[in-house]
Amino acid sequence: MLFIELLKAIFFGVIEGVTEWLPISSTGHLILVQEFIRLHQDKAFMEMFNIVIQLGAIIAVIVIYFERLNPFQPGKSPQQIRLTWQLWLKVAIACIPSIIIAVPLDDWFDVHFNHMLPIAIALIVYGIAFLWIEKRNQTLEPRVVKLSRMSYKTAFFIGCFQVLSIIPGTSRSGATILGAIILGASRTVAADFTFFLAIPTMFGYSGLKALKFFIDGNHLTLSQLLVLLVASLTAFAVSLYVIKLLTDYVKKHDFTVFGRYRIVLGSLLIVYSVFKSLF
């Protein structure tokens, strides 16, 4: 039984590692996959699992961008050190809206929107938004082509877009990338800032979910700990590849394909949801 559970954990880790960085909603995909492939765990663990598994993906960002994000990296010039600290300040400013709005409302949105139909609608709505933005941008040049040129005000408003991802199916990366592009950032800058913003956001969110799990009187069994570790390690390994793939992709392509994918998947989920309610 444990062997089968660990195989499922690997599968969920792959799903997380791929969908965390593509603008197609990792949490939404995990919830949907669990309609068909279930871990034999209680509800409290699964709610925590769906969020804490993201730590593996976040650690991949730190590994890939460690030199760029480390202000104490040997060999950096004074100007590079200053720009690194400024980047971290922008990331911190972008976290403010989530701290003020998303954290207090998280449980309410979990109760009312953590279902297939709201996920499907969110997939479609943001899919349409991606198609519209990319069509609009065909005649526009981005104003922000380097992270060092991004203002603190722009970083804050990108953080406001991140709050939208509190609705399952939205996609944290999708919301921040979409917001950054709307605010004039290039696709490369939008993707990079999304990766960096994920570090404090997801560490904090995962920490809160884990803390809530234990405060509510739950305990991790050895099998649950193994499932969580295996899934997180898999997400880490897959993320190392997907992050590099996405950074290369956005240099030559737009996000239209992801918009179309979201619309198709959301439409199929609505059909499935209706079919399931009838039968």
Swiss-Prot record:
It comes from Streptococcus equi subsp. zooepidemicus (strain MGCS10565). Bacitracin is thought to be involved in the inhibition of peptidoglycan synthesis by sequestering undecaprenyl diphosphate, thereby reducing the pool of lipid carrier available. It is an enzyme of class 3 (hydrolase). Disulfide bonds: none annotated. The chain crosses the membrane at residues 2-22, 44-64, 85-105, 113-133, 163-183, 188-208, 225-245, 255-275. One of its GO terms (cellular component) is plasma membrane. This is Undecaprenyl-diphosphatase. Belongs to the UppP family. Pfam families: BacA (PF02673).
